[in-house]
């Protein structure tokens, strides 16, 4: 378009004689061109065209085209191009003086845009050309005016500031006028600039001019740059107390959504939530991060002190914080009156402090990685899904915000320290101050310190502390699996259960059933474990143990270790059956909060032999240990029909183990249904409280949700015909059921615990012979807690076969095995009741049920799996 010329320049199309006689192809663009031959004296109006296109316009047209298209383009189609319409100036110089070239080009385009081949592209190009030329002219005009104003000397009587403001006002006035009073064709604000390097955008120009016009004011030296510009929390800058010292402290600062809003906690003593979950973590967000911003907040909290690791008092708290800021927070403050045992200054343990300067990981680095210094503080398992942003705090006195922004749970009121050592550790129960509702932690995986101290002080100190601390919250959870939380925090533990002292400072967990009782073997070394405490102190201390890391089916990142003996039996993966000292504590815990184990683990709690790691026999060292535990449990339980109250340790189930049948050494009465009081049922079940139910009552409760009425009770249990052998022995089996019901009320004479222990050692080899064993080998066996070896086990020695005198107690309904040995018994025409009674031979004398003597489960676990389906069908 730069080659276009207007008027009578050199670029004018000069038609030949033939073109003058006949209209050419471009003559139709102007209605005046159609009468060129007739009105030769009229000046012809031709629009500009590039020189290279001038030859194309001189092409001749047919002679008759002038007559055919003479009246085609009339004035009605183009009213603005009438003969009397004003025409432009022929000279390009005169037109450029009056109007810029770009404006003239736009006017030319607006007239001829209907005939252009690429209308939209040409429109865009002409607009850009016009905008560039107009902007360039305005800039040159402004520079000339600025030069002219700067050459004028200021008034000699004016001061320097007045002269500066006058020069700024004069220099800014033309630019402002050029920006505000713009041409009507200047739509540059809505157009992308053609060349960004040619001219700046109007917004940039205005902003730069506005800043240069003001007088620069020096900022205060103590005013940090982070106050002017918002800095993310992950940016490494020391935390400073700017809210009180800055002069704009009344302006509320902007709080990130991912951080704790302290203002909400300042106004409300208890942080408000929309709807906390039933067992969600409730950690009050009171930490040193809030105290750094507002140290006066500690006065609003009762029973709250600010003892630092250097022994600074509460009066020197302000000076201590300023000192910590000056020292780049290498000596942090310790809140909640933690007994740190002066380990912060221990030269042997350089990383004894809770927040170290050497921690060099960022929020983008996962805490589960093994390369950072926090690798030993976290379990190598994924984070649980029940984490809320308000449950964590970021401790600022760690030097930089990048190291403090990784969330950690606030263990309020806990005597805890962190160590950067490869040590597997167990935690004691946390004591939370009573100024806030008791809130427990549900961090099942990653954010748990792996190295914690025991509760300091004697039991009297703990009792006094509980007087103002309120009830204790639930204990920490294992990093390998989930453990339920206590719903009622006011009935968690009795205060006299806390017997830990400084002598037993490290309350690491005791051995379980997968470890040998070989004293104190410490996994990683580095700290000697005290081994000179007695059995009573260990049992009392370990009764409050929070979680174990040596379960058979749990996967830990660090190896477990063994300490003194503990009074509990580890079962399966996540369930723990403690002594009645834990069970007899007051408390109400519903079944829904019982355990986080799966349904199959609850169902097969400890009778399923497949859940055991090894077959428990008398040759394994675990058998003697379990028998010793069973002796302790026997002396504590009153009867198997009185189940314990809710297990107050979070690792303990809220019910005892599944009820077992008769085993060697039964000392208590038979299992009785708590609803219909029957003792003959093919399958024992449990209600939500853990009490035994018969199969009928349990199924009725499970299906209908209500207790089975006693009107539905019947003495007849219909049995399905599974095979032909069963149908042959129906009569004798019913007689044996009746005799079992009649005789099951009797009690066997109790034997000494030593005798039951001696008998328990022999059960895995072969059951001993009993008086009343049938010499015919009738294969009638009771439903034992674990599957017996074979039906011929009862024939090891002959016995008397006369009458009912030798019949032993059968606490459960006896099931007749359908084997070939039953056929000869059914050959007799009549099965008398006495004969039926004589066939009912239990496998062994009575033993305590599974809830009382857990050793019998593991002992009998290796005897085969002939009746394994009985315990696989345990439900509810």
From Swiss-Prot:
GO terms for molecular function: DNA-binding transcription factor activity, RNA polymerase II-specific; RNA polymerase II cis-regulatory region sequence-specific DNA binding; sequence-specific DNA binding; zinc ion binding. It is found in: Nucleus. CDD domains: ZnF_GATA. Its main location: nucleus. SUPFAM superfamilies: Glucocorticoid receptor-like (DNA-binding domain) (SSF57716). Residues 721-742 bind DNA. Gene3D superfamilies: Erythroid Transcription Factor GATA-1, subunit A. It comes from the Eukaryota. Induction: Down-regulated in nitrogen-sufficient conditions and up-regulated in nitrogen-limiting conditions. This is Nitrogen regulatory protein areA. The lineage of its organism: Eukaryota, Fungi, Dikarya, Ascomycota, Pezizomycotina. The gene is areA.
